Amino acid sequence: MVRFENKDPLMLARQLPIKSVALILAGGRGSRLKDLTSTRAKPAVHFGGKFRIIDFALSNCLNSGIRRIGVITQYQSHTLVQHIQRGWSFLNEEMNEFVDLLPAQQRLSTEHWYKGTADAVYQNLDIIRRYDAEYVVILAGDHIYKMDYSRMLIDHVEKGAQCTVACLPVPRDEASEFGVMEVDENDLILEFLEKPSNPPPMPGNPDMSLASMGIYIFNADYLFQLLEEDMSTPGSTHDFGKDLIPKITAQKAAWAHPFTLSCVTSNPELPPYWRDVGTLEAYWRANLDLASVTPELDMYDRAWPIRTHMEPLPPAKFVQDRSGSHGMTMNSLVSGGCIVSGSVVVHSVLFPRVRVNSFCTIDSTVLLPDVNVGRSCRLRRCIIDRACHIPEGMVIGENADEDSKRFYRSEGGIVLVTREMLSKL
């Protein structure tokens, strides 16, 4: 039941986030990213030159006014926990502000870890109840987007909803990777199908389907009741998309929230930006898109900053080598602590402390932190994992057969290089 008598949107935008807690589901492995997630959870994967993927959901919370956040972790959580402790410990607990880490601990005397997204929330129910929130915002920690959750909260309250699901149109041939819904003219969800083999099209647009973004808002008491019921339901997989949302839809209690209503953009002429960087191609492309002249995702928007752990690094440096060749870059992102010596970097992303030695050409490549590229190397359409040392004279990305033998080459021709792969050469 809505307790706010004042329905003024500006007032609600201030009040509703204060009465809310956000739970970020950050335990996913991200297996489609191959060896990039062999030692880290997908939300902890580096993105955009200096960030981690989870920084986007966390920053959206703070910018939306939600300052009570739980992060639910499981798979390979050390890197993620370390990042949050170092970069997100500035909130004031005395003001009831926090980022609370909730690792899988078999808290309910069960013999299993988190079995599904709903089970991950259920196993922390005693902690979540103590937050004493009126609304619970469930978020995925592995997507790239900027969104004002307070606008979705207002939509949730104004509709009198028990559950609200954020949604956006996606190409129908890609929709089988998402939960897909059908809605009426008032955005009431009529049907919800999790990853259907034949996704239903949107009315009047046969090439598009309406997909769930994995973002849900629940009235807290209603959510707690649902979770209790789901845990005692035979055959349930204890997953929001597979079990809870279809059940709520059947009860006519789930509403859709179009992403266009809460998407944050500095250029309204650009389409709403949301990316599931779950494959190597998608991850590579989303990183390089940021180096374009006018990227769809504006990382320079002071009104909606993306926060992260900031290391005390010197500025990037471009120097000439002993022969006089100058280090130079074009259409690229180069982070602090990088040194490019007598080499050319084109349309690439260099994370902190990358060193590119003389006579190299780096083209359309993502270099994660602490990579060292030896002299006279050529790298094209690559993702080089953290702390890799590329031997002098190595060429990657020009010979598909050779790349497939030494490294991992995706169907789209993106080459992933890790330290383990290099150690076997």
From Swiss-Prot:
Task: Report the EC code(s) recorded for this entry.
Answer: 2.7.7.27
* Family annotation (CDD domains): ADP_Glucose_PP, LbH_G1P_AT_C
* Residue spans crossing the bilayer: none
What keywords sit in the KW lines? ATP-binding, Carbohydrate metabolism, Glycogen biosynthesis, Glycogen metabolism, Nucleotide-binding, Nucleotidyltransferase, Transferase
The similarity annotation says: Belongs to the bacterial/plant glucose-1-phosphate adenylyltransferase family.
Q: Which PANTHER family match?
A: GLUCOSE-1-PHOSPHATE ADENYLYLTRANSFERASE, GLUCOSE-1-PHOSPHATE ADENYLYLTRANSFERASE-RELATED
Annotated protein name in UniProt: Glucose-1-phosphate adenylyltransferase
Q: Which organism is it from?
A: Serratia proteamaculans (strain 568)
Q: Which gene encodes it?
A: glgC
